[in-house]
């Protein structure tokens, strides 16, 4: 547990620790505890924490400091005690992208296969979609459960998906808001501590990380994605957890749909044994690793077979219904997608040339979706769950002139022309198809 301020050396001052990091010196666990506990309690003001964060952004943190920061943030709040629930507890975290919807597929697959999946998720911001926003497109679905109710849901069906509560890693919530306001978000050590402090607070035994790379990812280069993955895997392992990271492609959207209710429909298709091949492949691979790390199978290969069985037998689909029902949602949406929000209008983005799709700027797809009301620029912005993009052409596909590239599903046409222009510019079309097959899963680290 985090030590109280009175047990820390009285000579510590925030200004000294700011100077120390400014000068590239390593901070001890006690010094990091002092900063985090002091800032969380309000004893250290915003301006001093902002100065320290900028020093970290410039000078960086070593692996020991990252582990200490993660543990201090983790222990700033309540640790979810799931020891009373039988079975291993395993979760998945994705760094986010466009059409990134695997949580809604793998949670019921893995829960149906005998593990407990306590998933504390986030909302979309900027060009990336959020799991909570997708779930809230299901009428009545409640993502704001008290922790005791969350435990009950997990006990009943083995899966639960909620938002971060005030009790879970409060230091992270406060520090992230300050990072966002001071341009100190893009730092691997700070990103790792933010993600891992929330995930480890769930009381899990193992964690599977889906670290995206490419034009639609937070980390654009594979090198940066691998560095982040390595740090998160090591941090989790230092704390006694089994952790694996998959580096996966986000140079184009995952699946054929982006937008909240549209993505729910696509998830149901996969749980019904259909759906896009890439979405199905990644969902099964992530589920397989969860089964393996959770000791439900002796190998990842067995895990894939188990995941397939949960889909083919209908057990995963029924588990999804049960999870929706227990969180107050209308489970009928699983069999009748007309009960989900629908956009009033649609418009096609047409190709201006013929050839092959050689690349896409995937981030721009997410930006266009947000522009139409399907995303947020600020956390307090409202969201239109019916807005969506339906992708007809992927990298490597042949395209004729005047052929639809994307269908936009929208309610307000105020920014339609701007969104159409941005989407059209996001496609690169050349005379020849790109050579070689694009791997969906680039690398696997840890495990």
How would you name each of these model-derived features?
Residues 98-107, 111-112, 119-120, 126-129, ...:
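Short glycine/serine/threonine-rich phosphate/pyrophosphate-binding segments
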Residues 16, 21, 26-29, 39, ...:
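Well-ordered secondary-structure scaffolds
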Residues 60-121, 125:
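Active-site cofactor/substrate anionic-group-binding motifs, chiefly glycine-
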């Amino acid at each position: 547990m985090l030590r109280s301020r009175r047990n820390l050396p009285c000579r510590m001052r925030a200004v000294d620790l700011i100077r120390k990091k400014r000068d590239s010196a390593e901070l001890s666990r006690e010094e990091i505890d002092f900063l985090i506990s002091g800032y969380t309690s309000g004893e250290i003001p915003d301006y001093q924490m902002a100065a320290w964060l900028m020093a970290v952004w410039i000078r960086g943190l070593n692996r020991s400091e990252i582990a200490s920061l993660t543990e201090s943030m983790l222990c700033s709040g309540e640790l979810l005690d799931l020891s009373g629930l039988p079975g291993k507890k395993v979760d998945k975290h994705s760094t986010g992208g466009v059409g990134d919807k695997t949580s809604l597929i793998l949670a019921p697959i893995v829960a149906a296969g005998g593990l407990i999946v306590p998933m504390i998720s986030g909302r979309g911001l900027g060009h990336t979609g959020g799991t909570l926003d997708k779930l809230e497109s299901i009428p009545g679905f409640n993502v704001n459960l008290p922790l005791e109710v969350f435990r009950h849901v997990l006990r009943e069906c083995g899966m639960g998906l909620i938002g971060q509560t005030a009790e879970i890693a409060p230091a992270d919530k406060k520090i992230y808001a300050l990072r966002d306001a001071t341009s100190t978000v893009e730092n691997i050590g700070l990103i790792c501590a933010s993600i891992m402090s929330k995930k480890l607070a769930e009381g899990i035994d193992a964690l599977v990380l889906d670290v995206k790379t490419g034009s639609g990812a937070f980390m654009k280069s594979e090198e940066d994605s691998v560095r982040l993955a390595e740090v998160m895997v090591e941090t989790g392992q230092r704390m006694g957890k089994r952790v694996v990271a998959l580096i996966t492609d986000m140079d184009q959207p995952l699946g054929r749909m982006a937008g909240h209710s549209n993505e729910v429909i696509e998830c149901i298709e996969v749980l019904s044994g259909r759906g896009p091949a890439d979405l199905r492949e990644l969902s099964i691979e992530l589920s397989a690793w969860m089964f393996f790390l959770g000791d439900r199978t002796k190998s990842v290969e067995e895990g894939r077979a188990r995941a397939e069985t949960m889909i083919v037998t209908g057990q995963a689909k029924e588990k999804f219904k049960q999870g929706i029902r227990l969180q107050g949602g209308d489970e009928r949406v699983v069999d009748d997608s007309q009960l989900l929000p629908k956009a009033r209008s649609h418009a096609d983005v047409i190709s201006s040339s013929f050839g092959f799709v050689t690349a896409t700027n995937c981030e721009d797809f997410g930006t266009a979706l947000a522009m139409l009301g399907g995303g947020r620029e600020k956390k307090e912005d409202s969201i239109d769950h019916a807005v969506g993009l339906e992708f007809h052409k992927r990298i490597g596909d042949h395209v004729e002139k005047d052929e639809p590239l994307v269908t936009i599903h929208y309610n307000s046409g105020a920014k339609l022309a701007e969104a159409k222009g941005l989407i059209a510019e996001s496609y690169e079309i050349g005379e020849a198809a790109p050579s070689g097959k694009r791997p969906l899963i680039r690398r696997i680290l840890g495990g």
